[in-house]
Amino acid sequence: MSTGLRYKSKLATPEDKQDVDKQYVGFATLPNQVHRKSVKKGFDFTLMVAGESGLGKSTLVHSLFLTDLYKERKLLSAEERISQTVEILKHTVDIEEKGVKLKLTIVDTPGFGDAVNNSECWKPITDYVDQQFEQYFRDESGLNRKNIQDNRVHCCLYFISPFGHGLRPVDVGFMKALHEKVNIVPLIAKADCLVPGEIRKLKERIREEIDKFGIHVYQFPECDSDEDEDFKQQDRELKESAPFAVIGSNTVVEAKGQRVRGRLYPWGIVEVENQAHCDFVKLRNMLIRTHMHDLKDVTCDVHYENYRAHCIQQMTSKLTQDSRMESPIPILPLPTPDAETEKLIRMKDEELRRMQEMLQKMKQQMQDQ
C-alpha cells in the first residue's frame, strides 16, 4: 500500500548533528577504555615446557619469543642427567612490542624423563601447578586483592620424541596427570628428523593414542559464524595440524638469497618459518597471536575453578563438621573490635556467604545433570 509520502535527501544541518549528539550516550567507547587500561597495565603469561632432554625445548622457546632465557645454562653429561632429579626452574623476562608489555615466565623442568626409572617423575610438576593454584586462591581470598600476581601455568608445551612410534608410557602418565590442571599442547620435537610421510603417520598415531587413553589436550575454540572464510580456513588448518611438528634454531643461514633462521644440512636447508618444512609458524600464531587470551581464560574459568570448587567444598565440609562438635573449652568473651576490624570481619563473612551460595549452586547443577 502506497502512503503517498516522498523522502528527499538533504545535507546534515548543525541542528541534525546536535540531535545525533543528544542520542549518543557514549558507552560505545568502552572497548577503547578497556584496551587503554589493559595496555597500560600490561599482560602476563606463564608457559611450561616439558619433555626429556635433547628435544630442543630451550631452542624452541628462544625461536618463539626471540629471547635467550638460558644464557647461564650448564649442559650436563649423560651420567649427570640420569642421576638428576626433576627440578622446577623459572625464567621471567619483560618483553615490549609496539607499546604492549608482556611479562613472560617460562617454567622449565630439567631432569624430567631422563632417569632409568621414570615412575611418578611428573609428581614435582603436578605439585608445582597445585602450589600456584593454592597461592592464587589464598591471595584471592585475602583482604588485599588489587595486586594479585598470577603465577598460574597457562599452557604446557609437551615435547614428544620423534624417534618412537607414538606415545611412550611416560608421555601418557605425564599428560594424564596434568590434563585436568593445565592446557597441554603436544608437540613432535625435531621434526627435521622425519620425512613428511613419517610425520603424517606419527601425527595420526599420536591422535589415536590420545583418544585411546582418554587424554584431554587443549581444545581450540570454535570459530564464530560471522568470521570470514579466510579465518575459518586458517582455523581448520590449525586444528588439523595438531600435534604440531616443530623445529627450532637460533642460527641464521642463507637460503635463496635471503637470510632465514634454519638448519644447514649437506642435503639442503631446513627453514624454521617455512610452513612446508614444519608447523612452527602455526604454533607461534596459535600461542601468541590468536589463542593466548583463550589459554588464560580456560586456565581461569576451567582448571582453576575446578581447584577452587574443590577447596571450597573441603572448607564447607570442615565448617559443617566443626559446627556439629561441642567444644570442651569454654568460650571467653572477646574484646570489642574497632571499626576497621568490624569492617574486615563483615567483608570476610560476606565473602564466605558468597562462597557457600556458589557451592550450593554447583551442587544443584551436579544433581540436575
Swiss-Prot record:
User: How would you describe the post-translational modification of this protein?
Assistant: Phosphorylated by DYRK1A.
User: Keywords assigned by UniProt?
Assistant: Cell cycle, Cell division, Coiled coil, Cytoplasm, Cytoskeleton, GTP-binding, Methylation, Nucleotide-binding, Phosphoprotein
Q: Does the keyword NADP apply?
A: no
Q: Where in the cell is it found?
A: Cytoplasm; Cytoplasm, Cytoskeleton
Instruction: List the record's Gene Ontology CC terms alphabetically.
Output: cell division site; microtubule cytoskeleton; presynapse; septin complex; septin ring; synaptic vesicle
The Phosphothreonine modification is found at: T13, T336
Output the superkingdom of the source species. Answer: Eukaryota
The residues the record assigns to binding GTP are 51-58, 85, 111, 190-198, 248, 263
The cross-references to Gene3D superfamilies, in alphabetical order and at most eight, read: P-loop containing nucleotide triphosphate hydrolases (3.40.50.300)
Query: Transport as a keyword?
Result: no
- UniProt name for this protein: Septin-5
Organism, per UniProt?
Answer: Bos taurus (Bovine)
Q: By which gene is this protein encoded?
A: SEPTIN5
